[in-house]
Amino acid sequence: MSLTIQDLILKLKLFWEKQGCAILQPLDMEVGAGTSHPMTCLRAIGPEPIFISYIQPSRRFSDGRYGKNPNRLQHYYQFQVIMKPSPINIQDIYLISLQEIGININNNDIKFIEDDWENDTLGAWGVGWEVWINGMEVTQFTYFQQMGGLNCFPITGEITYGIERIAMKLQNIDNVYDLIWSNNFFQKITYKEMFYQNEIQQSVYNFEHSNIEFLLFCFKQYEKEAIKLINLKNPLFIPAYEKLLKAIYNFNLLDARKAISLTAKKNYTIRLRSLTNEISKLYLNYRKSLGFPMCKNNESIS
């Protein structure tokens, strides 16, 4: 029997724990991708090593389709792996992980398609590849070159599994709502039973009923609060980063609502990127003041 989504997540956690990753919990805030988790966005900066993995609920408002599209969602799950420094054989380890969850790499058409990644609001970009299995993208590979507008050294390797799409391959189905989330002696639960109404109602809200004036007000207030926090005598860069994420959330919802012009969108992006850069520099300087304590014998410091 193929893996349920619940079993898939558990197997990925166990696999990456065996590769030396600490298993973290998802960020308890609305984000567009697992990269926004501070354990990725901030920890990718500076020389200190980090090996972590976690599941992250993600929201991309513009991808909402009122529950009518079989494989496109405005809310979905990513499994994130972060390794710094990135192992030379990280792609081989990834292929082994596919076999571990039940995907035979010899009997399936697996392609690495060049696709460099960037996130303008986070001031981030990297060299990357999409991983396609039998014609569907299921994973994004990225080697971060910059985060928060700062150069990444050593390079951080990121693997982002698309949980729903991998589960569709494993369960051999074409509609995400037919996925089996869990199956035990109490009952079998499908993705539709768990999330179908969420997709419908959130799409209606995102595209039709989100209050534009309220979203603009929230954006400005969160931006203002973040600026205040980084300008304190003893800057609070972690709360500031959370306020930045709230501002990005409102910006993305305004964009999905088509409530801002291209010129305004560019202006907001510049403001968010600048704020991310200031927070990132504060984080890096703080870690430097501690002597980069996670570097064993200063081995990663140059």
UniProtKB/Swiss-Prot annotation:
Reaction equations catalysed: tRNA(Gly) + glycine + ATP = glycyl-tRNA(Gly) + AMP + diphosphate
Keyword terms, alphabetized: Aminoacyl-tRNA synthetase, ATP-binding, Cytoplasm, Ligase, Nucleotide-binding, Protein biosynthesis
Aminoacyl-tRNA synthetase found in the keyword field: yes
Source domain of life: Bacteria
Primary location: cytoplasm
Annotated disulfide bonds: none
Localization in the cell: Cytoplasm
Any GO CC annotation of this UniProt entry: cytosol
GO molecular function list: ATP binding; glycine-tRNA ligase activity
EC number, UniProt record: 6.1.1.14
Keyword Transport annotated: no
Top-level EC class as recorded in UniProt: ligase
InterPro entries reported for this sequence: aa-tRNA-synth_II/BPL/LPL, Gly-tRNA-synth_heterodimer, Gly-tRNA_ligase_asu
GO terms under biological process: glycyl-tRNA aminoacylation
Binding partners and assembly: Tetramer of two alpha and two beta subunits.
Family to which the UniProt record says this protein belongs: Belongs to the class-II aminoacyl-tRNA synthetase family.
NCBIfam families the record matches: glyQ, PRK09348.1
Record's protein name: Glycine--tRNA ligase alpha subunit
